[in-house]
Structures are given as C-alpha cells and as structure tokens.
C-alpha cells in the first residue's frame, strides 16, 4: 500500500508525520509547504507516526502539510564527472546552485549531480557474450587524469550475460551503453551512471585485505613515527588553530594516492571558502595540473542545516568506495567529525532519547565505528586492488582528548595524530605531539630505530620538566646533552615548513637518508667540558641540518652542507 502522510508536529528540523501505509527506515520523504518540496529522511518509526529529519530550514512548515513518500533511501549518483566538483551534502553541485540562486541558496532546490549534456569518449573493454557480475568493468572514459571505469551497477545480485554493447564513441551519462540479460531472460539497460544508497557499504569485491602498504604523505613525523597505511584509518584531534586544516591540505596535496575526497562537514564558512579558493590554485606535483582535477569536495558549513552534515559524511565515503572499485587508491579527509557528532546530539535530544556522556547519544561509538570501518583494502573481481584511506579531524573543546567523540574515534582508528596547543603556540608545525601520538602501521623507517628516537624524546621531555623546576644548573651535563639531542631531533626532523618548496614534501628516500644521519648523532657519545660548549655545538649541528632540509636533495648545495656536517662531527673525533 502506498504511504500517505501529514505533518502533525515540528521541533527545529525534526518533523513528526502521521501516516498510513508501509514505510522503511531512512526512507526519503518530501514535505509540501508553500509551493516547495523539502527533502527529509525518516529516522524513527512508531505506531502510525514517523519522525523525519529535514535537510532544509523548516520555517513555514505547518501542521496539516502533505508529505510525499518516495520508497527510496538517500542515494548518490555515481558516474563520470564527479571529480573537480564541489557538492553539498545532498550532492547538489554548488557552482550551479549559485548560478541559479545567487549568494543565498534557496531551499527545496535540488539539481542533478552529473552534467546530463556532456559527452564522454567511451572505450569498450567487454564484448557481447561475456558473463558479468556487479562491479565488473564494461569499458572506460578519461576523466581528467583518471581512467574512469564504467561498471555494472552494484545493486545487481546475479550473473548476467552481455547481449548488446555500444562501440567506441561519445555518449552522455544517460545514453544506453549496454544491455544485459539475467538467468530468467529479463533484460536490463546499463548507462554510465547509477544510484547507490549512502548508508549501505559497497561490497562488490572478492575479499578484503589487511592494510600493510604505507601511504607516504611526505610529512616526516607522520611517515617515520606515526605512519598511515593505504586502506587504514587515522584521526587528527586538536584544538582550534592548531593546524588541522593545513595539515589535511598538505596531506591531500602530497599523499601517495590517486584521488582525494574532502568532506568539509560543519566547519566554519571561512575555512570552507579558504579550501575552495586554494585547491584550484594548488598544483598537483604528480601531474603538474590543478589539484582539483583529482579532487571532489563535499561541503556543509556550520551555517547549513545540521541534518545535512551527516549526509555529507556518508556521501563522501560512498563516492570514495565507488572510485575504489576501479582499482584506485582513495584518501578521504573528513573535517570535522566533531560537528557531525554534534548534529547527532542535537537530533538525539529532539527525539528525547536517553543521553550518554556529555549528552551525546548512547550509540555514538557504533555510528563512528561503522563510518571508519568502510575504509579498507579490497581485491576486486578482476584481481586488481583498490583502497580507501579515511582520515577524520576531531575538534574537542579546549583540546580535551578525554571527551566522548575523541575517545570513540580512538577505539576504531589505526593511527592517532594528536595536535596540541602547546606545540602550535611554540610554532612547532605540524603540531603533532610525538609523546601522545601513536600508530599501528609500519612506517618508512625500521621500527627499532624509531622507538630508540622516541625514547630520546621522552627522556628529553623529562629533563626539560626537571629544568623548569631546578634550572639548568640542577641537571648533570649528560642529562643536558640528552635534552639537547631531543631538541635537535624535534627541530630538524619532526618540524617541517609546509610553505617551503623543498621542505613541504620530503620523499621516502630522503626521509630514510636524513633519519639515518640523526640516528647516528643520537647514538654518538659526545664529550663536552661544560654546558655552554654542548649547547654551542648542538646548535651548529641544528643549523646545518635545517639548511640541508631546505636544499634540493643530493644536489650541490645539499652535498656541501653534508660535508660541513661531517667535518663538524669529526671535530669531536666521531667517525662519520
């Protein structure tokens, strides 16, 4: 029986609907008010009533307004043309919305996610008579720098036989590409695009693998000490102004991945505008073209309705899974998951659910876990491998890592990059705290060597805390040298200048080379007459290595500085 309903209550963006018929959880409905149709999603079903969260401002909705039930879940449209686009959480292209509406978006206006008129040059790889299943490739088109595979829609559950496929040529996303036949003789038309529900993980692959290949970000502190694996998960919690957004932008520019998906979820409009302005101007170091050519941005600012924040996170992960099915490596950056959790808290309060810690819903952990679990490395039907790596920034109030969102995230991620106010105020960027952060993945340097270096950082911090109480004269010269060595490692290796053309991105080879130099220095037993001599010598080493960091690797300037460094160390009768 087709469902029918009317509005019987409105609280903020939560609308209660009295209905007759059959509905399903997460079904999309349209509320008719003032000549507009406002999209909403059913989030609770009770006897004769449903509660729906509205993705628009609810001003003007009145008791008695008609509600149209679609019998469909919230979906995204998948096909060529997603890259270099900027969407809102409901996959409306924002540049086209701006053309239609101006600076202030009208509610109830929904546009097609893909350009219906653009023609793509299709190259067929399958042929008539081939047997196929969901996720198999029929052909490809060139999308920017990516070989965009045209696939059998993921909702096809059986094996099919191709009975018709078009020849190479130019087609739109709505043109018929192939006709397939099921075992019962039913025929199905395939186009370049199809829809997929955002809250349902894509499972059209053979098997999942354990992430073990390092995703090189070219940021020294991450790749060496707190690495991230392709298909892994990581979180970047930190207070406001600690550098989360810049770190994510640097990662997206330099990471060893094919495509970057950015979900700007509930961030301040200023930060989102900064991202939208900067990304088209950034040069992709791999291709020399604009970084936007392999980027898709899903943005919902804090001024947009809270329900759309959740939609933006799920839209981003679904698009990531779609490109993963082509055998590509995808990096999804969600900024910030705290805003999404706050939206859940707001909706949970309106539903009058029993609250958990700090009034967040009791199911917060399971929802966050289900999002991060959609990351992973998979083997596709044809044997190729694709991955989705998920990195979420968390914005705990006051930098308090004990709050529920951070704690729920820490339980499910494989790496923790904790930014601290202390390091950002000291202008030590990236402001990742080397004492609190951790990773479960393998890095670019041997584990034993990095643990030895981390032990120096811990010991150096202990000496530093002691000196704050008793002063420099209150510690032995040996402890003082340990402190100086830890500061040397911090300033020369853990810190990095994101705005320098050389130091912004450090290759795998260079990281290994420079770490080995510092590792030997940490292991060396220096003999000094007094603390003044120790400080002077270590400062000379520091300046020399900092200059090396800014010099092109193994070129004339770098080689000269390396000779100077070796001469400095030999002056202490050390064999380098």
From Swiss-Prot:
Q: From its record, what is one biological process in GO terms?
A: proton motive force-driven plasma membrane ATP synthesis
Matches recorded under CDD domains:
ATP-synt_F1_V1_A1_AB_FliI_N, ATP-synt_V_A-type_alpha_C, V_A-ATPase_A
What keywords are annotated for this sequence in UniProt?
A: ATP synthesis, ATP-binding, Hydrogen ion transport, Ion transport, Nucleotide-binding, Translocase, Transport
InterPro entries in alphabetical order: ATP-synt_VA_C, ATP-synth_a_Xtn, ATP_synth_asu-like_sf, ATPase_a/bsu_AS, ATPase_F1/V1/A1_a/bsu_N, ATPase_F1/V1/A1_a/bsu_N_sf, ATPase_F1/V1/A1_a/bsu_nucl-bd, ATPase_F1/V1_b/a_C
- Enumerate the catalysed reactions: ATP + H2O + 4 H(+)(in) = ADP + phosphate + 5 H(+)(out)
The EC number(s) given in the record are 7.1.2.2
Residues reported in the UniProt entry to bind ATP: 238-245
Instruction: Cite a GO CC annotation.
Output: proton-transporting ATP synthase complex
Domain of life per record? Bacteria
Q: Does the keyword Nucleotide-binding apply?
A: yes
Q: Which GO terms describe its molecular function?
A: ATP binding; proton-transporting ATP synthase activity, rotational mechanism; proton-transporting ATPase activity, rotational mechanism
HAMAP family attached to this UniProt entry: ATP_synth_A_arch
The protein's job, in short, is: Produces ATP from ADP in the presence of a proton gradient across the membrane. The V-type alpha chain is a catalytic subunit.
Q: Which family does it belong to?
A: Belongs to the ATPase alpha/beta chains family.
Question: What is the name of the protein in this document?
Answer: V-type ATP synthase alpha chain
Q: Which organism is it from?
A: Borrelia recurrentis (strain A1)
């Amino acid at each position: 029986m087709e469902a029918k309903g009317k509005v019987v209550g409105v609280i903020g963006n939560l609308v209660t609907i009295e209905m007759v018929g059959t509905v399903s959880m997460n079904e999309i409905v349209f509320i008719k008010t003032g000549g507009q149709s406002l999209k909403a999603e059913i989030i609770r079903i009770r006897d004769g009533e449903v509660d729906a969260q509205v993705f628009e401002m609810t001003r003007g909705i009145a008791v008695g307004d008609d509600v149209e039930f679609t019998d469909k879940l919230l979906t995204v449209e998948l096909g060529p043309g997603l890259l270099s686009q900027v969407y809102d959480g409901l996959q409306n292209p924002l540049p086209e919305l701006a053309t239609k509406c101006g600076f202030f978006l009208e509610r109830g206006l929904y546009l097609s996610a893909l350009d219906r008129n653009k023609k793509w040059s299709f190259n067929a790889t399958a042929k008539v008579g081939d047997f196929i299943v969901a996720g198999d490739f029929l052909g490809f088109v060139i999308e920017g720098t990516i070989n965009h595979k045209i696939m059998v829609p993921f909702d096809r559950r059986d094996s099919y036989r191709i009975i018709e496929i078009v020849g190479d040529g130019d087609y739109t996303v709505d043109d018929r590409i192939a006709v397939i036949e099921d075992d019962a003789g039913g025929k199905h038309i395939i186009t370049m695009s199809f829809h997929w529900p955002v809250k349902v993980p894509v499972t059209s692959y053979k098997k999942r693998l354990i992430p073990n290949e390092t995703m090189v970000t070219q940021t020294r502190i991450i790749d060496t000490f707190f690495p991230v694996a392709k298909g892994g998960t990581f979180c970047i919690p930190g207070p406001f102004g600690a550098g989360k957004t810049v770190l994510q932008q640097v990662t997206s520019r330099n990471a060893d991945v094919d495509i970057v998906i950015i979900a700007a979820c509930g961030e301040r409009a200023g930060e989102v505008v900064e991202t939208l302005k900067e990304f088209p101007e950034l040069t992709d170091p791999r291709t020399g073209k604009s970084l936007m050519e392999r980027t898709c941005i899903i943005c919902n600012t804090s001024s947009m309705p809270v329900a759309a924040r959740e939609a933006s996170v799920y839209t981003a992960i679904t698009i990531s899974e779609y490109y993963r099915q082509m055998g590509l490596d995808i990096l999804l950056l969600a900024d910030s998951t705290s805003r999404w959790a706050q939206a859940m808290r707001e909706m949970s309060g309106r539903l009058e659910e029993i609250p958990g810690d700090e009034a967040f819903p009791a199911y917060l952990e399971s929802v966050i876990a289900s999002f991060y679990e959609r990351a992973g490395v998979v083997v596709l039907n044809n044997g190729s491998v694709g991955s989705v790596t998920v990195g979420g920034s968390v914005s705990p109030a006051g930098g308090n890592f004990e709050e529920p969102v951070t704690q729920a995230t820490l339980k499910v991620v494989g790496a923790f990059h904790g930014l601290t106010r202390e390091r950002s105020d000291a202008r030590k960027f990236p402001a990742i705290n080397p004492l609190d952060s951790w990773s479960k993945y393998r890095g670019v340097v041997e584990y034993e060597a990095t643990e030895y270096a981390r032990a120096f950082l811990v010991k150096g911090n202990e000496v530093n805390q002691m000196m704050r109480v008793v002063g420099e004269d209150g510690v032995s010269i040996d402890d003082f040298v340990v402190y100086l060595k830890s500061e040397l490692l911090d300033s020369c290796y853990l810190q990095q200048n994101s705005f320098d053309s050389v130091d912004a991105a450090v290759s795998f080879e260079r990281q290994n080379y420079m770490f080995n130099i510092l590792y030997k220095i940490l292991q060396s037993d220096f003999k000094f007459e007094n603390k003044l001599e120790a400080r002077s010598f270590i400062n000379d080493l520091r300046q020399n290595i900092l200059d090396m960091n800014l010099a092109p690797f193994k070129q004339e300037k770098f080689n000269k500085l390396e000779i100077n460094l070796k001469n400095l160390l030999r002056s202490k009768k050390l064999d380098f």
